[in-house]
Structures are given as C-alpha cells and as structure tokens.
C-alpha cells in the first residue's frame, strides 16, 4: 500500500516509521528542504529527535504534495489543527481516486470550532473520500519512534474503516484498538490538553503529586461532563482516548501542553509564554473553544474556566489555583 503522511513533525515522522516497519510504501511531506535532505540522506529528523535516533531508511521525504499523495491508498494528516484547511486545499488537486483519510491531530477547527472529523469530511468531496478515521490516544512520538510499546485507537463511524486502519498501523510495538465513538474520542483527546496545561502549572508552582492527582481526576469529570452533553459515550472517556491520553499528557515531559504549563506556573503568568513560545501547544486554543461552548450551554467546568482566565485574561495562575481549591464543598459525584 502507498501511504502519504502530511507533516514531518514528531507524530508524523513516528507514524511514517510505523507504516514503513509494516512494509508499506511511505512518503512523508515536509515544508523544509533541509529536513527532506536529512531524512532521505542521513535517516534522521534531528530537529525533533536529536542526532542519536535513526529512522527507517525506507521513508521517502518530499516537498511535493503530488509526490506524496498521488495514487496513495491512505493519507495521514499529521499537522497542527491550524494547518488542516490549507493542507487539504493543497492536496486535493492530486487525489484522483477514493482514498481513506486518517487524522492524527487533536483539537478543533480554527475557523468554526467544529470537531476536526466534521470539518475534514466537509472539505473533501464525497467521491474522493473512501473512508475517514482518527488515529489517536496516549501515544508520545518520542516513545513510538524508538519502538516502545504503545496502545492507541483507530476511531471511525464506519467500523470496517476503523478495522482497516487498525490493521494498517498495528505491529509488535503499536497495538491499535477500534472505536466508533467519534464524538467522545475527539473530545477526550482535545480537552485533555487543557487539563495538561493546568497540571503543568501546578508543577511549576511547586505543588505536589497529591494536588496534581486531584486536579487531573477533577479534570476527567469536566471532560466527561462536556463530552456526554455533546453525545460522547462514557466508555470512551474511560478508555485510551479518555483517561489513557489524559494520564500520559498530564504527567510527561514529552507533552508540550504539560511543559507549557510548567513554564507558565514558574512565571506565575502566561504573558511571556504566549509571547515567545514557538511550539504547537494545542491546549491554548482548545481552552478558548471549550470555555465558550461550556459557557453557552451552561456546562460546569471550573478548571477550564480558570485556565481561560490564565491564558486569555492574564490572571495569575497562583490566584486561579487557590480559587479552584476554595470552591464550595460538594459531593465527589458533582
């Protein structure tokens, strides 16, 4: 099978290697000529993985959309949410047959605040869309690239497509489960980034493990409350795209959102981070989207509200954490 992977960042490169390890013909699209040359000649992607990690030498990196996607059986979208629309616009002229599109991003559309699956399926003509799935869950690229055992989900409304993508990616170090709850899976992996920033802030403010465990647990309550309102299923939030992704993202140095929170916490302000940060930190935008939707539909989400005030109203993280801790006492079920 030919697979075109759009995006030569950490996750795109890691997924490209998985597919190459599974004996597929993989073309990896980059926007940077030096990165293409390094991948093809030295079999490294040093910007993201350093000089010590070598990647599968069969990966073919390219600057050309045509080379990457033409005649591909599958196309993997491994780019930040802000780039999804432009990427689809650029690749569509080269799609000549029905193709399965696989989304690997976590977040919301930048123009409409819709879930990514909804927008991607709207942008691709029906006669070119053989199927759609999301490959998501608790998978840090830094571990997948060195072939550490990882488990994620192939999520699609069409169970046959979910199974097809499951087989495409599964091997002895990447175990893929299927899921048909598109709403729950997408909301779970998106909102957990907000909680991960909050967890990092606690670390930056020198709170302990007890505090972070409590915050992450209460954060799961908020994810479930929001997700159920919009049609997600409880079992999804208890699975890999829910609590699984939440656990790994809220506690790992590999998580950009967690690292962002640590910086914000140490500064006791988001101002410098937002001004100078160059990494893709999806949780920042997701905070605004989820806050606005929760406010519109009267969904109780105090952690998300506090994060919105920190990121968008320049509230002091230390004050917001105290406000959350001092909320009225209630049952844990609430």
Give a label for each model feature.
Residues 55, 62-70, 74-147, 165:
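Rossmann-like NAD(P)(H) cofactor-binding subdomain of soluble oxidoreductases
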Residues 199-200, 228-238, 242-334:
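NAD(P)-dependent Rossmann-like dehydrogenase/reductase catalytic/cofactor-binding core
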Residues 6, 10, 14, 34, ...:
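Conserved active-site and cofactor/substrate-binding residues in soluble primary-metabolism enzymes
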Residues 83, 94, 123-131, 149-197, ...:
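Internal alpha-helical scaffold of NAD(P)-dependent oxidoreductase catalytic cores
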């Amino acid at each position: 099978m030919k697979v075109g992977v759009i995006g030569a960042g950490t996750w795109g490169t890691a997924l490209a290697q998985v597919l190459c390890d599974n004996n597929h013909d993989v073309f990896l699209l980059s926007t940077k000529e030096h990165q293409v040359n390094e991948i093809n000649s030295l079999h490294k992607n040093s910007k993201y993985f350093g000089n010590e990690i070598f990647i599968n030498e069969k990966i073919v990196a390219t600057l050309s959309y045509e080379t990457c996607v033409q005649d591909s059986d599958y196309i993997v979208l491994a780019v930040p949410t802000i780039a999804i629309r432009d990427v689809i616009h650029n690749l569509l002229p080269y799609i000549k047959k029905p193709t399965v599109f696989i989304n690997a991003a976590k977040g919301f559309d930048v123009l409409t605040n819709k879930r990514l699956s909804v927008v991607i399926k709207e942008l691709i003509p029906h006669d070119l869309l053989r199927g759609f799935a999301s490959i998501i869950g608790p998978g840090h690229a830094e571990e997948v690239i060195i072939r550490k055992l990882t488990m994620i989900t192939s999520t699609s409304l069409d169970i046959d497509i979910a199974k097809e993508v499951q087989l495409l990616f599964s091997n002895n170090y990447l175990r893929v489960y299927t899921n048909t709850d598109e709403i729950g899976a997408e909301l779970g992996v998106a909102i957990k980034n907000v909680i991960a920033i909050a967890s990092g802030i606690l670390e930056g403010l020198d709170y302990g493990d007890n505090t972070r465990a409590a915050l992450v647990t209460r954060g799961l309550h908020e994810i479930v409350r929001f997700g159920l309102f919009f049609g997600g299923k409880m079992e999804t939030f208890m699975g890999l795209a829910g609590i699984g992704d939440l656990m790994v993202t809220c506690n790992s140095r590999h998580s950009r959102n967690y690292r962002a929170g640590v910086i914000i916490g140490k500064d006791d302000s988001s101002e410098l981070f937002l001004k100078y940060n160059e990494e893709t930190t999806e949780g920042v935008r997701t905070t605004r989207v989820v806050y606005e939707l929760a406010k519109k539909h009267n969904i109780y989400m105090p952690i998300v509200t506090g994060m919105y005030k920190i990121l968008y109203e320049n509230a002091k993280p230390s004050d917001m954490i105290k406000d959350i801790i001092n909320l009225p006492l209630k049952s844990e079920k609430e």
